[in-house]
Amino acid sequence: MAATSEKQNTTKPPPSPSPLRNSKFCQPNMRILISGGAGFIGSHLVDKLMENEKNEVVVADNYFTGSKENLKKWIGHPRFELIRHDVTEPLLIEVDRIYHLACPASPIFYKYNPVKTIKTNVIGTLNMLGLAKRVGARILLTSTSEVYGDPLIHPQPESYWGNVNPIGVRSCYDEGKRVAETLMFDYHRQHGIEIRIARIFNTYGPRMNIDDGRVVSNFIAQALRGEALTVQKPGTQTRSFCYVSDMVDGLIRLMEGNDTGPINIGNPGEFTMVELAETVKELINPSIEIKMVENTPDDPRQRKPDISKAKEVLGWEPKVKLREGLPLMEEDFRLRLNVPRN
């Protein structure tokens, strides 16, 4: 009996890739799956990975928040494949790497369909881990700074366990990601799966959904439309904003590095919501007003990543400052909103 128990607790070596991947009929390319690859961050990750001619990229997306428009320049490319697929259903495919990004990341979307959100986080992650186990792929999960909840430690290191409301309106996302991290480590310990976990902080840039309720996209859209910038009270709550190209660089470094994580990927530059609104106003439309509105439940008072581990382990830190990134996002929003420059 003791021998059986000991056997069950033994960590298994990583599974071998399918023999078909090493056959003489296969190209020696790296075949990479991105779940949620038609979304904001996912599509930028596709762009970066496609720069390497040894990469074949497969995107699986159900277009709940993503858009085929984000990938239009790659459709028809011989190294690119797009599959309409919901990760809550199993996917049978041969790959070497899995970037698991699929999940609504905006409060508007995940509050609209909280059950779908937690199913994506839990069942979707189980399916991606099952795929990784079958084919011997390395898998990276994009977790979130939301696992820290309304933090009592500032800035937040990876060792902080968080302060999360498990039954609040945001918990489908916050707790869903915490469960996803648990599943990743359980598959790693029990089945030897190669895992990587990134805790990503607020990210902004071109291709964000215009009306997704996130603060940077809200402010830029309002400024371009000539509307008042609506700051949720009290306005002193803080966030740290990472430009999407820096985020993608961090994710790729983590995937190809040797550390399982979790590792914070974010920009430690911290701004209050009033400071962000004033910056957007100054850069885009100085004539508009800033208006205070009621806040939503469980909104964290402060959020700033401790990126010491990312610097040490990945040699990564963000390069794009907020004042450099906002105009790039403004240009994208101008085109999509049909707002000409004066």
Curated annotation (Swiss-Prot):
Its cofactor is NAD(+). Catalyzes the NAD-dependent decarboxylation of UDP-glucuronic acid to UDP-xylose. Necessary for the biosynthesis of the core tetrasaccharide in glycosaminoglycan biosynthesis. Substrate binds at residues 170, 202, 215-219, 232-239, 299-303. It holds the Pfam family GDP_Man_Dehyd. GO terms for molecular function: NAD+ binding; UDP-glucuronate decarboxylase activity. The active site is at Y173. Pathway: Nucleotide-sugar biosynthesis; UDP-alpha-D-xylose biosynthesis; UDP-alpha-D-xylose from UDP-alpha-D-glucuronate: step 1/1. Keywords: Cytoplasm, Decarboxylase, Lyase, NAD. Optimum temperature is 30 degrees Celsius. It is found in: Cytoplasm. One of its GO terms (cellular component) is cytoplasm. Ubiquitous. NAD(+) binds at residues 61-86, 173-177, 214. It comes from Arabidopsis thaliana. Its EC number is 4.1.1.35. Residues 1-11 have a biased composition (Polar residues). The gene is UXS3. SUPFAM superfamilies: NAD(P)-binding Rossmann-fold domains. It catalyses: UDP-alpha-D-glucuronate + H(+) = UDP-alpha-D-xylose + CO2. This is UDP-glucuronic acid decarboxylase 3. Optimum pH is 5.5 at 30 degrees Celsius. Belongs to the NAD(P)-dependent epimerase/dehydratase family. UDP-glucuronic acid decarboxylase subfamily.
